[in-house]
A protein has these predicted regions:
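Active-site rim elements
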Residues: 329-333, 377-386
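Flexible, active-site-proximal loop/turn residues at the rims of small-molecule/cofactor binding pockets
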Residues: 48, 78, 192, 265, ...
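Noncatalytic carbohydrate-binding groove/subsite architecture in carbohydrate-active enzymes
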Residues: 199-356
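Flexible glycine/acidic-rich beta-alpha junction loops that bind and position SAM and/or redox cofactors
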Residues: 131-134, 269, 314-318, 367-371
Length: 517
């Protein structure tokens, strides 16, 4: 007996309708590509703080158990600061009384060990400048226009900066082994968009020195960047790595194994102001297509991995629904719908334009799990009591997809409904169907959808298991609302909400194919 797993997100009626307005035909015999699971990634400004706390341990355990994530990324690998009362990072560099460097990677190793023992992989950022290496001149800048706070400047001693990165890289080999570290990714900075435009060459030198430092320890380690969010920054950076003069060896260009970029549905600074802006998947699709057009200008980079290693419906991690009611979409079913629709759209771009995204990294972790109140509207994956928000449930649903993507044909062009279909080598299939139009706030669409299958095994029995994420199923936020939206949860209420997210298949049925499959 073959198994078909059907996962529905806000599909109110998915059946064999007499006069369906939307029909999808799934051809099980037509493989269109690999399911690369590029979305299995998350991050936060505060991982070095949260990972070793009970809330972080709980989420890491859940990620391992559900296979919802593979990569984790965070800032402040080299320095520590405090934002909104929460520590970020650690100080790994100091100098003794004689001015000699002293390294302490103990906390970094401790945090990364928590990843590795669960099969998770770090995206390592070598940032920011330790205080002893800061340039004391007035050159450089502070932060960027999205609220990041860092010193955008070159070090006062380039050799010591290089030696720090070499020491960190060698430390990872000593602790985790070369084979493991070869599966990681390395960057030198985060969102350098605030770098003074007349000093971009200093950042290019930062990148060149970083690449030399990491690859001099092991040439197989993967290096890239620049983790920016403005195209006006990305283009000259790519021109440097392709055509510029390398600041280390004087040659042409600099190695880059992956290109990283950030996209959000809207800036957090635009919330609660006119004009009213809603995050839309189309914004991401258009940005990716513009990036594809940009990459055409650099044929030498063809085939280089492209990472969106920060994304979210809205930027800004500390704003809440109390002050910004629009952020309810960070709590409710819109977040997983947005995620699934975005994943499907990026696969469509890969198939149509031959521009695959190798990583899509959601910026959120467990920052709400340490709060007393629940569903406060931050961009996290869990809330108080380590209860998963619907966005985490969306990741867990995507994790049920199989290895090969199969063809899906639709009767008409439509941006509301979509189906992502996959199969495994043994013939099992898993499909996700969604119903989501970003501009229809609170509108429940009643249009029926039909799924037609071809290419199945003739005269065979298929067992269908159905899982739903909607207002009544597997939805912690709607369950919380039905319980009266209590600000604080009792142990019994926590246990009840956790029980909502076990993704049980409540509807099961069998069907037999005809002699044509």
């Amino acid at each position: 007996m073959r198994i078909i797993v059907l996962i529905y997100l806000a599909v109110t009626c998915l059946a064999k309708a007499q006069k369906p307005e939307t029909t999808f035909t799934i051809d099980a015999g037509e493989v269109v590509g690999e399911n690369t699971e590029f979305w299995k990634a998350a991050g936060s400004d505060h991982l070095f703080y949260h990972v070793t706390r009970p809330s972080g341990q709980s989420l890491l355990d859940r990620m391992e158990a559900t296979k919802s994530h593979k990569f984790l990324r965070t800032h402040h690998t080299f320095v520590q600061d405090k934002k909104k009362g929460v520590l970020r990072g650690q100080n790994v560099y100091s100098e003794d009384k004689n001015g000699n460097p002293v390294y302490d990677f103990s906390n970094v190793n401790k945090v990364f060990s928590e990843y590795v023992k669960r099969g998770l992989k770090p995206v390592v950022e070598y940032d920011y400048l330790p205080q002893q290496l800061e340039n004391k001149t007035n050159e450089g800048s502070d932060g960027n226009d999205e609220g990041m706070k860092m010193k955008n400047m070159g070090p006062n001693n380039w050799k010591r900066w290089s030696d720090l990165m070499k020491a960190a890289t060698q430390n990872f080999i000593d602790v985790f082994g070369e084979e493991e570290v070869r599966t990681w990714y390395f960057e030198v900075w985060n969102e350098p968009d605030g770098w003074p435009m007349d000093q971009l060459d200093v950042f290019y030198k930062m990148y060149d020195v970083f690449v030399d430092a990491v690859t001099s320890i092991n040439d197989e380690f993967r290096v890239g960047g620049p983790a920016c969010y403005h195209e006006y920054f990305l283009r000259p950076f790519l021109n440097h790595v392709v055509n510029g003069t390398n600041h280390v060896n004087g040659g042409k260009g600099t190695r880059i194994d992956f290109i990283s970029y950030h996209i959000y549905g809207l800036s957090g600074k635009w919330l609660n102001s006119e004009p009213h802006i809603l995050p839309q998947v189309q914004r991401f699709s258009q940005s990716i297509l513009w990036l594809k057009r940009l990459m055409n200008d650099f044929p030498d980079l063809k085939g280089t991995e492209f990472h969106i290693n920060e994304w979210g419906m809205s930027s800004n991690f500390y704003r809440t629904v109390e002050d910004h009611p629009d952020l309810v979409y960070r709590n409710n079913i819109e977040s997983p719908l947005f995620l699934v629709k975005l994943v499907n759209s990026l696969y469509q771009i890969e198939d149509k334009y031959n521009f695959p995204i190798s990583m899509l990294l959601y910026w959120g972790f467990c920052g709400e799990a340490d709060a007393n109140e629940v569903f406060i509207g931050k961009r996290e994956l869990t809330i108080s009591g380590n209860i998963p928000k619907p966005i985490q449930t969306g990741f867990e649903m995507l994790a049920q997809l199989k290895e090969k993507r199969i063809q899906v044909l639709r009767q008409k062009k439509d941006s509301r409904f979509g189906v992502l279909a996959t199969k495994s080598g043994n013939g099992e299939m898993a499909l996700i169907a969604y119903n989501y139009n970003e501009t229809d706030i609170g509108v429940e669409n009643k249009e029926k959808v039909t799924l037609q299958f071809t290419g199945l095994e003739p005269n065979s029995t298929y067992h269908v298991k159905q899982t739903k994420l909607d207002q009544n199923n597997n939805n912690t936020y709607s369950a919380w609302e039905k319980a009266g939206s209590p600000k604080f949860l009792s142990k019994a209420e926590i246990a009840k909400l956790k029980g909502v997210t076990y993704l049980d298949s409540r509807q099961k049925e069998d069907f037999v194919t005809d002699n044509k499959g």
